[in-house]
Amino acid sequence: MPPSGTEVGMIRNFCIIAHIDHGKSTLADRLLEATQTLARNQMSTAQVLDDMDLERERGITIKSHAVQMIYKSSDGKEYTLNLIDTPGHVDFSYEVSRSLAACEGALLVVDATQGVEAQTIANLYLAIEAGLEIIPVINKIDLPSSDVEGVARQIIDLIGVNRDEILQVSAKAGIGIGELMEAIVQRIPAPADNRQLPLRALIFDSVFDAYRGAVAYIRIVDGVLKKDDKVRFFANGKEFYADEIGTMSLKRQPKNVLEAGNVGYLICSIKDVKDAKVGDTVTLVENPASERLAGYKDVKPMVFSGLYPVESNDFENLRESLEKLSLNDASLVYTPETSAALGFGFRCGFLGLLHMEIIQERLEREYGVNIITTVPNVEYRVVMTSGETVEVDNPSQMPESTKVNWIEEPYVSMQIITMSEYIGNIMKLGMDRRGEYKNTDYLDTSRVSMHFEFPLGEVVFDFHDKLKSISKGYASMDYEYIGYRRSDLVKLDVLLNGEPVDALSSIVHRSKSYEWGRKLCSKLKGIIPRQMYEVAIQAAIGSRVIARETISAMRKNVLAKCYGGDISRKRKLIEKQKEGKKRMKQVGRVEVPQEAFLAVLNIDE
């Protein structure tokens, strides 16, 4: 078959692996400049590939992006470089693994002032598993605080390369970019020439376009895809016509043919991003491939939280906003739920804490919806006395303790990288959070990698913030899910004057329930306003109350108008006031202010 377009041997597909803030998006800007994909004066925005406001502000990449560049090498040949930009954060590790599967090589970018971090190592292992050629790059060498040789030693210990294979660049100042471009062309292998095989294309990302429907970013692994071909998606068996195909250089460039080795996009009037799942394989209806590409899995949410509008008439607005967000984010799961305290809202499932924060922030920023979030929970498995297993992600669904045989909770294996002087602090945090310490490896004289196993429920809360504060910002963490284990968990209810408040209940470990209950009651005492009658705040497990605080009643002085006079007259007035308060207490409902629900989220402060 005659080659059309670029020869497969002239294509290089690569990605950049880096920790948050190590300069990945800035380096991508320099590569775009060096290949004249963008002139410097067009760089109105730094970090061209991070096109969401939130991505720029937090300095993170949330979605995968792809861009094609043409590079004229020193040997006079023209190469097509496809840079696939990957998210760096632990919550998005499945998206990262799919982006890596679309590449043949990876640039491992490490900050010369910070050294190797936990998420870099996690993504590096994914890249090595995918069989990628790794080019180590030390960035920010022009900063006065950089320690190039120290960082180079860490990289050599980590992946066993020679010192002369490690490149030194400064993305901001544009130092060393020429050598980097040559290394990409020389060291990263070309894709395999599988044009004669049946079509198999890997979807490594999908975005939603209001006019065109879902746009799938694809890497053609085998075969050839032509415009107007009829294609089938493996995950759901649905068939579509390829209305438009093409390559991505900052804007979409329509083409008539995409061949094995190419990276591009596919538009075929798909209404829902959930039909173009990340990791799925696309093949032709006429001459289909017999099996899909390896590595596809359905992403399961790990963290659950209730989202409620602050104004109850904003419910429809919240529903529409979630629908729009989920068009672009196939990993967001939500179902409507009601709460006696908060009214109508949604139970949402997220990949992890960062994902949850991003969704909340995007709802407030892009859609203008003010929301209250309930305590984040994980999914527990409850084995009933009858033998059946129930999955519970909301404390209010927890069955009565008499019917429960045992409860299992998800565990994660965590790697924490930090300076050696903070080991003691981190060990203490690990023990406080029911962590199981495994081992410590020294990366060099001053940095260590510590391994723990934690219940996910202890990590989703505020673990990352605590870790940063006890290590003065130096520690970084990465975790992966390892399965369910049996635990002694109880449901802790909060009662106001004997009435349970569903939005304040939580599932905690029995050993921590007393302390948690005490803290929660005293925190609520400071937040719930005083009433005309006494309010009892109780924390209870089942029918047993384990902690109590009392908000005393506001009292009017009924004796103020009695000057002297008979004691029985005074007693009568006081008794009458008591009666009134008793009646008030029976009919009165304690209004729980919104701060009370937020108080549960930061109970240690």
Swiss-Prot record:
Q: EC number(s) for this protein?
A: 3.6.5.n1
Regions crossing the membrane: none
Tell me what topology the record assigns in the membrane. Peripheral membrane protein
Q: Give every tr-type G domain span.
A: 9-192
Q: Name one GO molecular function term.
A: translation elongation factor activity
**Enzyme kind, highest EC tier:** hydrolase
Subcellular locations according to the entry: Cell inner membrane
Kindly state a single biological-process term from the GO annotations of this entry.
positive regulation of translation
Keywords, A to Z? Cell inner membrane, Cell membrane, GTP-binding, Hydrolase, Membrane, Nucleotide-binding, Protein biosynthesis
Q: Can you tell me which residues bind GTP? A: D21, H22, G23, K24, S25, T26, N139, K140, I141, D142
Which InterPro entries does this UniProt record tie to the protein? EF-4 (IPR006297), EFG_III/V (IPR035647), EFG_V-like (IPR000640), EFTu-like_2 (IPR004161), LepA_C_sf (IPR038363), LepA_CTD (IPR013842), LepA_IV (IPR035654), P-loop_NTPase (IPR027417)
Which GO cellular component terms, listed alphabetically, does the Swiss-Prot or TrEMBL entry include? plasma membrane
Output the superkingdom of the source species: Bacteria
Q: Tell me, in one coarse class, where this protein mainly resides.
A: membrane
Catalytic reaction equation(s): GTP + H2O = GDP + phosphate + H(+)
PROSITE patterns in alphabetical order: G_TR_2
Stored NCBIfam families: lepA, small_GTP
Summarize the protein's role: Required for accurate and efficient protein synthesis under certain stress conditions. May act as a fidelity factor of the translation reaction, by catalyzing a one-codon backward translocation of tRNAs on improperly translocated ribosomes. Back-translocation proceeds from a post-translocation (POST) complex to a pre-translocation (PRE) complex, thus giving elongation factor G a second chance to translocate the tRNAs correctly. Binds to ribosomes in a GTP-dependent manner.
Family, as annotated? Belongs to the TRAFAC class translation factor GTPase superfamily. Classic translation factor GTPase family. LepA subfamily.
UniProt name for this protein: Elongation factor 4
